[in-house]
Amino acid sequence: MKNIEIEDDLYAYIASQTQHIGETASDILRRLVMPENTVVKTVVAAKPSATTKKPVGDVFSQITTDELSEYPKMVERFLKILSVLESMHGAQFDEVLTLSGRNRVYFAKDKETLLQASSVTNPKQIGESTFWVMTNNNTAKKASLIKEVAEVLGYNANDGQRLAALFAPELYED
């Protein structure tokens, strides 16, 4: 593993290209600069097939662009969306605890678990729930986490993308 120094604007661009939780800078750069026919040694673990979970209620009637615009800070929007999802899904929301990066824990049942994983996680409680989330990620990573949460709760990819676009519309403008 080699370390390189890059300018802030380039770092921000690379970080904004994150497509899923746990994707490393090397993964992102490979995807961006290597031709598709280049062989890269990767191991893909197959997910066991499970019965498809159905989302409970209409999340889009409870999270609107107007409502989210009342939250000027991205971390507040992030927490609002997670809070609505948690309140709609109850015990099923426990499945977010399975989401983690290679060396990161994103969700926990208590603040201490996140602080033990890293002292710079800036953990925040999700609404009035017993769940906590790491918040020191950039906007693109938070949007990616929202999509991952939606997926584990049974939403299709399109709805996960819609939730992420509600959170950070500037990331999804054409």
Swiss-Prot record:
The keyword Cytoplasm applies. It is found in: Cytoplasm. Its main location: cytoplasm. SUPFAM superfamilies: Replication modulator SeqA, C-terminal DNA-binding domain (SSF82808), Ribbon-helix-helix (SSF47598). GO terms for biological process: negative regulation of DNA-templated DNA replication initiation; regulation of DNA-templated transcription. One of its GO terms (molecular function) is DNA binding. Keywords: Cytoplasm, DNA replication inhibitor, DNA-binding. Disulfide bonds: none annotated. The keyword Lipoprotein does not apply. One of its GO terms (cellular component) is cytoplasm. Belongs to the SeqA family. Homodimer. Polymerizes to form helical filaments. Negative regulator of replication initiation, which contributes to regulation of DNA replication and ensures that replication initiation occurs exactly once per chromosome per cell cycle. Binds to pairs of hemimethylated GATC sequences in the oriC region, thus preventing assembly of replication proteins and re-initiation at newly replicated origins. Repression is relieved when the region becomes fully methylated. This is Negative modulator of initiation of replication. It comes from Pseudoalteromonas atlantica (strain T6c / ATCC BAA-1087).
